[in-house]
């Protein structure tokens, strides 16, 4: 079975920025890929937090040029929240895939086995994250959109303009 493909339709500063299409590595990280896929479709309804388990209308709250663009905190919006489809946090599935360069999709965490809904898209090779963050996908279309998001970031991670997932879902 081919790996699922999901999308984010992004806006930057209230203006449409385009679509990011990602392939999820369900073949190597099925649990992590399924969490992200279901958070793209919103099919699991409301989570324990009382918020929808859905990336729609969430923001990229931390963007560091030359490093990564981070999002997925749909409960607090600032990097302190988020929730997985499995309940609060879930274990690191494996570290088979590596942070090999731009477009790698990986789980943000607060230490071992603390995966929720926060993720990041690499904009460079970040090999120091290997063995610490679970790589579960890659951007297959829309790296230009990722680059546009990267442009509004800063060394502190604060964005100059609001970066929002206006819509998201599954393509295949």
Curated annotation (Swiss-Prot):
Domain (PPIase cyclophilin-type): residue spans on this chain: 7-170
UniProt catalytic activity: [protein]-peptidylproline (omega=180) = [protein]-peptidylproline (omega=0)
Pfam family for this entry, one: Pro_isomerase
Matches recorded under InterPro entries: Cyclophilin-like_dom_sf, Cyclophilin-type_PPIase, Cyclophilin-type_PPIase_CS, Cyclophilin-type_PPIase_dom
Domain of life, per lineage: Eukaryota
Modified how: Not glycosylated.
One of the record's GO molecular function terms: cyclosporin A binding
CDD domains xrefs: cyclophilin_ABH_like (cd01926)
Entry's EC annotation: 5.2.1.8
GO cellular component, as recorded: cytoplasm; cytosol; plasma membrane
Locations listed in the record: Cytoplasm
Biological process according to GO: protein folding; regulation of protein refolding
Function: PPIases accelerate the folding of proteins. It catalyzes the cis-trans isomerization of proline imidic peptide bonds in oligopeptides.
Membership in a protein family: Belongs to the cyclophilin-type PPIase family.
Annotated protein name in UniProt: Peptidyl-prolyl cis-trans isomerase
Organism for this UniProt entry: Catharanthus roseus
